[in-house]
């Protein structure tokens, strides 16, 4: 989830102990950052697998082929990770020894083309030689095939070599046609309610007995921290039930952005076509479009005071301090028409691409048994605690992450709660997206 915060899809923001993220800009990067350069320890382990398997006198040929394929898969994935972050990397493909120190003088790949050539070579071996079935948590030929198609598609994007498109399509089609797996409508693919769905071709699994919410940032750093007193002071129209104690007691600093939310299209109720929420007929018929450049004062859109007298405003003074003509803070300014029978949240979020509902926590949805309010003054909103712009372990964007979260942490979302957690490394749906 930290890498998602390096994209327009997410942010990392804390206005308390962790501070504001300054690594999301080029000015925040330095030679002191490790963005995947130092993978030599991992590569040594992988290369030892490949070398020792090939030199084994106890393994039969079938065992050698399969075990070596595991090594090729892991090396291909490491190289792919490095290529995506840096383009070029040091392609370590042998096991170094103290007796031959000169062997470590390996130059970086000449260019991106050489980088992807090495990646594809390793992943093709894995896609050919891994077994078609394996225990949950172990890779198969089908998982390797999807990874191969992913890497080949990326290779085409950065090299322009059209032959990689053939590799991507062939690998994806092989998985779709021959794996015997079908797409699932289950949203439990991304949480604990459907851990072993067949569409998950390869997952990383952690058992409940030794896994806690605090063990992973994807959990501890996505659940907010909001008390009953916060909600009362904020005058939220919807109270938190707090059925098992404080429901949300995480340290959220990662949040999805409006940029990401806008990518999930809405079905137009008149035409049946998928389009951005702000272009649908049902939305346009219920709002008046105003000029966003006319927003010049704090609280101009909406404002009120909490019980303790603290102001809560849209926009906030900080919003107005961050104006940049190249990247406007305010891009849309709409007012709900008088007499409209639906509010803005319903108009924005109803009829979305179904993936939206498994990925994002949004205003008026249900989350861990609570009805979520994310509008001004809401129970999990940006200003519900003492930071008007959010960031005290609560949202700064108006949304929370739901994908790959735990839907029903027992008894509640706090650091010591034990959970059964998994991450999808590869799933069948990606093969279809590659073909598309």
What are these regions (language model features)?
Residues 1-10, 150-382:
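An aromatic- and glycine-enriched ligand-binding surface/loop that stacks and positions planar moieties
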Residues 7-86, 106-117, 121-138, 308, ...:
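Conserved, well-structured interaction surfaces
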């Amino acid at each position: 989830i930290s890498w998602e915060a390096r994209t327009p899809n997410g942010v990392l923001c804390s206005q308390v102990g962790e501070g504001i993220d300054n690594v999301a800009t080029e000015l925040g990067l330095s030679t002191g950052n490790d963005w995947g350069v130092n993978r030599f320890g991992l590569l040594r382990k992988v290369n030892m697998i490949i070398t020792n398997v090939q030199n084994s006198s106890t393994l039969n040929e079938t065992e050698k082929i399969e075990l070596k394929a595991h090594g090729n898969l892991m090396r291909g994935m490491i190289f792919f990770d490095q290529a995506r972050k840096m383009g070029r990397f040091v392609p370590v493909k042998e096991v170094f020894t103290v007796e031959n120190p000169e062997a470590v003088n390996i130059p970086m790949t000449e260019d991106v083309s050489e980088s992807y050539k090495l990646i594809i070579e390793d992943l093709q071996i894995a896609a050919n030689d891994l077994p078609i079935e394996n225990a949950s948590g172990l890779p198969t030929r089908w998982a390797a095939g999807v990874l191969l198609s992913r890497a080949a598609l990326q290779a085409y994007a950065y090299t322009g070599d059209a032959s990689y498109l053939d590799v991507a399509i062939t690998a994806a089609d092989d998985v779709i046609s021959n794996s015997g797996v079908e797409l699932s409508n289950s949203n439990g693919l991304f949480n604990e309610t459907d851990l072993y769905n067949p569409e998950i071709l390869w997952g990383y699994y952690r058992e409940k007995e030794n896994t806690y919410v605090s063990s992973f940032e994807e959990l501890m750093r996505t659940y907010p921290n909001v008390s009953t007193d916060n909600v009362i002071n904020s005058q939220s129209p919807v109270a938190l039930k707090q059925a098992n104690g404080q429901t949300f007691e995480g340290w959220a600093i990662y949040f999805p952005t409006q940029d990401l939310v806008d990518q999930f299209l809405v079905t137009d109720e008149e035409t049946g076509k998928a389009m951005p929420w702000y272009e649908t007929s049902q939305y346009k018929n219920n709002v008046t479009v105003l000029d966003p450049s006319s927003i010049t004062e704090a609280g101009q859109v909406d404002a009120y005071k909490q019980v303790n007298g603290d102001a809560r405003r849209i926009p906030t003074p900080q919003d107005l301090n961050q104006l940049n003509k190249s990247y406007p803070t305010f891009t849309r300014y709409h007012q709900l028409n008088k007499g409209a029978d639906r509010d803005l949240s319903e108009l924005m979020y109803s009829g979305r691409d179904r993936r939206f509902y498994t990925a994002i926590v949004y205003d008026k949805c249900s989350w861990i048994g609570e009805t979520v309010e994310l509008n001004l003054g809401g129970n999990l909103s940006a200003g519900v605690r003492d930071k008007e712009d959010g960031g005290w372990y609560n949202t700064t964007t108006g949304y929370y992450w739901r994908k790959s979260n735990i839907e029903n942490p027992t008894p509640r979302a706090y650091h010591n709660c034990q959970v059964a957690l998994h991450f999808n490394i590869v799933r069948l749906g990606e093969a279809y997206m590659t073909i598309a």
